[in-house]
C-alpha cells in the first residue's frame, strides 16, 4: 500500500533506529548507565525498596549464574560490587534483561533531570507526531527499553517535551519484540483491530512478527541502521524518514 494512501488508527513506533539514532543509545545512554551504576547503587542500596527489588530480580535471570561463574572468587554475599559488575556485564553483551532496563531507566532519569542527558530524535519526528495527532491518530511506543526510559527520551528531547504526543507505551513486559504474540497483546491492549495499527521499526524480524499478528509495517532506513539484505528489502516496505507519512489518515 503506498504510504500516500495509507490509513491507520494507531502509529506504533520503535525508538532505537526509528525515532532515535542507534548511536545515541549505544554511544551515549549505555555508557552513561555503565559509568554511573556503581555510584547510583551506593546511594540507593539501603534506602530504595525499588532498587532492592531490582537486585532480587537481577539475581533470578539465567545470566547471573553465568556471570558469577566467571569470577575468580565466588561472591559470599550480594553487594554493590557484585551487582555493578553484573550490570556492566549485561550492558557489554547488549542483553535485553527486564530488570536491567528498569535499573538503567532510573540511572538515566538522574542524568536527564540534571541536564547531563538530552534525548535524541531525528529532525522529522516532531512534525510527524504533530501531523498524526492533528489527523486524529494515536501514537504508541514499543521498545525493549523500559516504559520509564522511553518517556525520558521524549520528555527531555533535544527539541523539547514530545511526551504529550504519546498515548501509550509498551516494553518487554508485553512480550519480546520478535514474537507475534507480543503484537497481538498490544492490539488487544489498545482495543484496536491489528490492521488499523501501523508499526514502524528498523528490524526485519520485528516487522515480520508484527505482520504475522496482522499489523501494517514499514521499515526505517535511518543513518547508522544495520544494512538490509536484498531479500529483506524485497519483502518489506521501506522509508528513509517519516516525511512520507505526514498524510496518514483515519479509516473512513
UniProtKB/Swiss-Prot annotation:
Binding site for Mg(2+): 14, 16, 202
Protein keywords: Amino-acid biosynthesis, Cytoplasm, Hydrolase, Magnesium, Metal-binding, Methionine biosynthesis, Nucleus
Pathway it works in: Amino-acid biosynthesis; L-methionine biosynthesis via salvage pathway; L-methionine from S-methyl-5-thio-alpha-D-ribose 1-phosphate: step 3/6; Amino-acid biosynthesis; L-methionine biosynthesis via salvage pathway; L-methionine from S-methyl-5-thio-alpha-D-ribose 1-phosphate: step 4/6
Entry's Gene Ontology BP terms: L-methionine salvage from methylthioadenosine
Location within or outside the cell: Cytoplasm; Nucleus
Gene3D superfamilies: 1.10.720.60, HAD superfamily/HAD-like
Purpose: Bifunctional enzyme that catalyzes the enolization of 2,3-diketo-5-methylthiopentyl-1-phosphate (DK-MTP-1-P) into the intermediate 2-hydroxy-3-keto-5-methylthiopentenyl-1-phosphate (HK-MTPenyl-1-P), which is then dephosphorylated to form the acireductone 1,2-dihydroxy-3-keto-5-methylthiopentene (DHK-MTPene).
Subunit structure, as described in the record: Monomer.
Name of this chain's protein: Enolase-phosphatase E1
Organism per entry: Drosophila pseudoobscura pseudoobscura (Fruit fly)
Amino acid at each position: 500500500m503506498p504510504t500516500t494512501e495509507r490509513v491507520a488508527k494507531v502509529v506504533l513506533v520503535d525508538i532505537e533506529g526509528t525515532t532515535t539514532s542507534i548511536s545515541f543509545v549505544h554511544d551515549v545512554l549505555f555508557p552513561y548507565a555503565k559509568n554511573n551504576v556503581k555510584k547510583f547503587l551506593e546511594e540507593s542500596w539501603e534506602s530504595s525498596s525499588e532498587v532492592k527489588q531490582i537486585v532480587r530480580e537481577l539475581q533470578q535471570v539465567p545470566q547471573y549464574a553465568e556471570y558469577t561463574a566467571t569470577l575468580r572468587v565466588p561472591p559470599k554475599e550480594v553487594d554493590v560490587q557484585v551487582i555493578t559488575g553484573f550490570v556492566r556485564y549485561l550492558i557489554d553483551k547488549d542483553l535485553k534483561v527486564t530488570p536491567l532496563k528498569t535499573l538503567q531507566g532510573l540511572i538515566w532519569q538522574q542524568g536527564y533531570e540534571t541536564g547531563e542527558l538530552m534525548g535524541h530524535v531525528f529532525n522529522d519526528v516532531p512534525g510527524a507526531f504533530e501531523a498524526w495527532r492533528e489527523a486524529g491518530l494515536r501514537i504508541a511506543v514499543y521498545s525493549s527499553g523500559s516504559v520509564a526510559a522511553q518517556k525520558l527520551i521524549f520528555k527531555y528531547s533535544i527539541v523539547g517535551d514530545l511526551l504529550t504526543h504519546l498515548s501509550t507505551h509498551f516494553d518487554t513486559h508485553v512480550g519480546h519484540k520478535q514474537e507475534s504474540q507480543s503484537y497481538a497483546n498490544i492490539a488487544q491492549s489498545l482495543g484496536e483491530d491489528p490492521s488499523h495499527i501501523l508499526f514502524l521499526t528498523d528490524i526485519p524480524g520485528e516487522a515480520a512478527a508484527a505482520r504475522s499478528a496482522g499489523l501494517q509495517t514499514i521499515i526505517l532506513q535511518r543513518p547508522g541502521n544495520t544494512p538490509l539484505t536484498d531479500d529483506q528489502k524485497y519483502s518489506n516496505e521501506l522509508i528513509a524518514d517519516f516525511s512520507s507519512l505526514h498524510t496518514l489518515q483515519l479509516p473512513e
